[in-house]
Amino acid sequence: MERASAPLVTGVGQHRYRALALVLLVACGPRVEVSLPPADAPATAVAIAGAAVLIGTGDIASCTSTGDEATAQLVDSVLKADSAAGVENHVFTLGDNVYPRGSARDFERCFTPSWGDPTRRIMKWIRPSPGNHEHDTDWAAPYYRYFGARAGEPGKGYYSYKAGEWHVVVLNSVLAVSPRVPAADRRAQEDWLRRDLAEHPTRCTVAYWHHPRFSSGTHGGVIRMEPIWRILHDAGVDLVFAGHDHHYERFLPQGPNATLDTLRGVTQFLVGTGGGTLRGLRRPYARNSAARVQGHFGVLKVTLGSGEYQHAFLDVTGRVWDRGRGRCH
């Protein structure tokens, strides 16, 4: 694939911000509707001492697109800058890592030249999750072979790890949504999740997977993810990342039935902008949808501090379309 020009990434948290309260671009260009910082907002994010960084996206590599090459360059640039500053980094993927079917050939021809490029830092810190496209080939066997132990136990794909002071949970949403999955396997993941959360009673927790519980995109929210969301909500989990729909969207904290919950609700980020064909939004927008960006490849960078976090959605030029901060429950 052809290499895009290098994105603007000048250092830890030093990215351009658009000083507008609301942007709505239509007509010829990509449509963007997102709440942005006020005009007097600082031009750089405030660093969180001792924080770890999660950066990634979903719906990534395709041999018919150069979007994955651009997002790979962006992620690698951030990793390089953060590493120079001694920041702990982890790269997440939100499923559909490679198109069209997640075969070994797809990984070799389409993923390796961009996100899997050994000259980049991505594979050193990658923590993937599987999507439905990986399961189109031998029930994701090539995915597990490609990523090895970093993908969790073959056939399961769920695992957890530590990032700074945060607990991070990775789930296989295909086990929750596919009618091909035996009920026993679905329950096994749910039981594992309950045990894992009980064994790691940290104040701050983030979980990620492929199919979103809530979405204003063409696929829409996936009701079969409600049991997982309920477990997370009951345990006081703070953040969820998902993909599947090919746009960016941030939601207000909510319960499993889209009830606004500012005290214990889970905040979902949908980031399906890694390189697969971008898609639009549907009206009316999903309840509690707070920010939406369509028509831009990009990644989510979340800085995980002690009891707090900062988030920023960057497109492949380094421009930040949505940013903010929050505190853990």
What residue spans do the PLM features occupy?
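Sec-dependent signal peptide recognition
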Residues: R16-L22
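N-terminal active-site segment of His-dependent metallophosphoesterases
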Residues: V32-D106, R187, R195, S215-S216
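Active-site flanking residues adjacent to catalytic metal/cofactor-binding acidic residues
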Residues: G58-D59, G95-D96, G131, W209, ...
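Extended active-site neighborhood of metal-dependent phosphoesterases/phosphodiesterases
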Residues: Q73-D76, Y99-T205, G220-L239, H247-K301, ...
